[in-house]
């Protein structure tokens, strides 16, 4: 049972950091002073240029024409007046028709289409739009000014603002006009000018709305160089009358989380309540997402409890964040439960949530669960995107099902989705791991034709596949191609080539290559040295392997468990079991936790030497240390006991292996069947064979020979006739396939 969160009650350490956080919002201001509200001044009177008698008559004529017109367009009605029309006439006509807002807009559009309007007339129409509550038109008119090319921002701002103030009193007197002007400046990134508007409005006794200030705060928070300014603004604006609201706090909480300062964000959530504000779902969801990013699941659950106590229900954003975290830390059962709870609450999961789950299950190798969610998306009419397809394709590639991966890749194109470099690279990687290099290069060519440039990861994947196939010449060609197109091979690229050289027996060439890329400024890593050690161990040069280890340690590189397992395998492979046990004891003494692979090397060699007592002792030792045996452990022990004809023990271990869900190889089935046949346990041999057949595995020629020999010797033919027929069929099919290839 989780302990309930104490809300505003804080531990001493938390209280201390909370005080520090409040001090963060009480920093000295730096050049952000305000004029006091007592120094306010009135808006100026508007005094337009006086019209001459002739101009007055001309304006009167135009006004009558546009007022009396019916359905006739203005361009036709005012055609006779075009040549005499001047900018001053525009303002004088606007004064006559300002009570008819629709007519104002039509006339202003007509005037602007004939000649450029001056800034004064633009400000007048902006005021009239705001007075008519048409804020969208006002915003559009202000934006059109700032969209002009080659505009001197500093001078233009002064002129625009001064004229907006000058025309304010007689043309609208709606303070929202300055909010709109301010917000447009912020949208255009003119933050310094926006700040000046805020300060200048204080001189006239006006404080911009909290919505405008929130727009400003949001823009500041998105600029990594202005986060300090955002904090100062958040602290200072209330001093001159800005009343922050919940949305304001949410903005600050969000950008504090983005800075990675999740504790401070949580403190700000508490500060909201101290100041009398009630956090909403967005407030909590932002902090929850922050804790999810940093993997602090316990704090997430506590915040959820607080939310529920306050009557707030988690939203889709919160569920998505929690599911994402649970998938990242491999708690997929809990992630699935959170998903089910989301559905029960009536919240429809989106593409992001489904993709997160699909990706999580694929990475664990549970392609069945991933596929279930993928096809469930279709049934809910939720469209998979490129990321969704990439995740599921990667999952099928991971288990080697390249047929299904290829089908899904084709399906993407049919649905109009364009794979990105990650999708192409995942598919290429799958084909490379499956040894289908022709298909890998086919996808590589497709990638280039689709206009998607292969990156270092793509080339490294292909190089790795070629090296594992032993085609080092082609791998080197690709390496040179990388250089040619300006891609810099990284340590993963070179490690693939080093591994290929070692696998082909060219250890000295591999060592030479390491020297060359290190001389070029690229440092070898633990994988590089472990690969060289493995090559020397397999060739029996244990002294050189240990020298490589010393060199690696001398460079400050930390060996991994794989490094020690390579050394252990080398000792065991060459009969140096005492050295292997010494290495194991040294690892334990140094606090280096061995894994199943470490113990397996010893178990295997003791089984090969028929020393089942020692093998069993190693097995018991690993179990007592909390290291669970894997499939290889059981295979080694089953084969060892079969070889020693301890069929009872072999059968027990085989059953335990199956019970734990480990896959059994053909060779293990074969050894067990042969063991039972040698001990004349025909029923047991048949039972193992039936299990093998249910797994879809075909017996080899050796098993066929064993059953044949037993049959012709007249030993229990009723138990073996059916298996012989099946073995012959499978064996002949295999032979035909080999002949065809």
From Swiss-Prot:
Gene3D superfamilies membership: Tetratricopeptide repeat domain
- Where found, per UniProt? Mitochondrion
Keyword Repeat among UniProt keywords:
yes
Q: Which residues form a coiled coil?
A: none
First-listed, main subcellular location of the protein, grouped into a coarse class? mitochondrion
**UniProt-listed PANTHER family:** PENTATRICOPEPTIDE REPEAT-CONTAINING PROTEIN 3, MITOCHONDRIAL (PTHR47941)
Q: Organism, per UniProt?
A: Arabidopsis thaliana (Mouse-ear cress)
Q: Which InterPro entries match?
A: Pentatricopeptide_rpt (IPR002885), TPR-like_helical_dom_sf (IPR011990)
Which family is annotated?
Belongs to the PPR family. P subfamily.
Q: What is this protein called?
A: Pentatricopeptide repeat-containing protein At1g05670, mitochondrial
What are the PPR repeat spans here? 174-208, 209-244, 245-279, 280-314, 315-349, 350-384, 385-419, 420-454, 455-489, 490-524, 525-559, 560-594, 595-629, 630-664, 665-699
Query: Mind telling me which residue stretches traverse the membrane in this protein?
Result: none
Transit peptide, residues from-to: 1-21
Q: Cellular component per GO?
A: endoplasmic reticulum; Golgi apparatus; mitochondrion
One Pfam family from the record:
PPR
Q: What keywords appear on the UniProt entry?
A: Mitochondrion, Repeat, Transit peptide
